Amino acid sequence: MDVAANPRIHPTALISPEAELAADVQIGPFVIVEGPVRIGPGCVLRAKAHLIGPLTMGRNNVVYDNVVIGERPQHFQYKDEPTGVEIGDNNVFRENVTIHRGTTHSWMTRIGNDN
């Protein structure tokens, strides 16, 4: 795990050794960060959030309780191809949101800024 400076990580959180966290990231209780996930400065992951890589998250995003980002898509066309999620800056993901990876080889689910 590439951790810059001192992010605040709750002791019950599980963070992949492949994860890269910016210095001021805050990670709450029972959060899971799985696989190659890059989390930018100012991001907050609240209780029980689950992020699955490949996933890149920009600056100042807030992920509320029970959000899942990066899971395999619920689509018959998906055949376990390498896909992922890219998230911009200043987004808020409220409770229980799910965001799946792209469906076809090399496709990314992309979420821009200020959502």
Can you describe what each PLM-predicted range is?
Residues 81:
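Glycine-rich NAD(P)-binding loop of Rossmann-like domains
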Residues 7, 13, 19, 24-27, ...:
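A structural motif detector for beta-strand N-caps
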Residues 105-106:
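Internal nucleotide-binding/catalytic subdomain
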Residues 1-9:
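Generic start-of-chain signal for non-secretory N-termini
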